Amino acid sequence: MEYTLLGKTGLKISRVGLGGIPIQKVDEEQTKKLLHLLAQQGVNYIDTARGYTVSEQYLGYALEGIRSQFVLATKSMSRTKEAMEKDIQISLSNLRTDYIDLYQVHNPSAQDLEQVMAQGGALEALQEAKAAGKIGHIGITLHSADLFAQALELPWVETIMFPYNIVENQGEDYIAACSDKNIGFICMKPLAGGALEDATLALRYVMQNPHVSVVIPGMADEKEVFQNIQAVEDKRPLQADELSKIQEIRKTLGTQFCRRCNYCAPCTQGISIPGVFLMEGYFKRYDLKQWAYSRYSAMAKNASDCVGCGVCESRCPYHLPIREMLKKAKDTFANYK
């Protein structure tokens, strides 16, 4: 297994890690079996989140006796100091540890980020927890390229997590900038949320980029572990047939795939268009139907509120048929009721 340093954190991590979303689909014993296999194979980076229902709890159970073999990262969507303090304590309890290596601000909007950094914001809780030795380092996870650019200039940001894959490469320049600033870059969504069926090709594409510190595909079984490790350790340049397949994937998938750049905003009806498509992806491709449906239903406005004005489509740099895509998402969730 190849290891690298996670930017200025100085943490020594494997180039491939565990993305914790699929843990929600298995049980504690399967999670324990998975983590012991990862430890045997030298995979030492685990990412989870407060928002991934039982993921933290199952990982905590599975880490008993082997916690020291892993670099553990989690994240919270809390934006205030009080709420973040509570979430840090819950994470410590769930994960059955007295120390979390990396705690991240989870997917803030521009407005959320202002709140996080304001007086009484979540950053205060994170910095106090770091000073107290409860967490080691502070990072941020994002889906907006504009916020990625902003995060690069924030002195407290030690790591940045952002989607990067065959069809989502809008953050490439900022990923390179992470190296310049010694910020660890964590690649999420390497399989585009399950939209890319050839996992080996998807991971080989990501690992061609020398500025990626670690890639965190979701894994839930032994086959996926060995397949992903083999792909990440394959250092050959992409071959002609692989490059041809990548172009074909971009041509086919790119016309119906939301990159979550948010240039379509603001929607005239207040719909979070990228949010709708994100939940639709979890529903269809991760097979997390109830989890995705509950989050979709909790949105103040969702796909059913679309009036078909088309303003979003005039702004989309990828010329996506957003109105048609929203109708499909609306039907997907309506049929689940």
Predicted feature residues:
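N-terminal binding-site loop/beta-alpha segment at the start of enzyme catalytic domains
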Residues: 1-70
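Short hydrophobic/aromatic-enriched beta-strand-loop microsegments
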Residues: 69-72, 157-165, 236-242
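Conserved residues at the C-terminal ends of beta-strands
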Residues: 19, 49, 103-106, 141, ...
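Structured C-terminal cap/extension of enzyme domains
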Residues: 39-44, 173-187, 191-337
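Conserved, mostly hydrophobic/aromatic
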Residues: 6, 18, 46, 59, ...
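Short catalytic-loop micro-motif centered on adjacent basic/acidic residues
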Residues: 44-49, 73-74, 136-139, 159-163, ...
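Alpha-helix-loop-beta-strand connector modules within alpha/beta enzyme cores
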Residues: 56-75, 123-132, 182
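Glycine/proline-rich, positively charged
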Residues: 29, 40, 79-186, 191-194
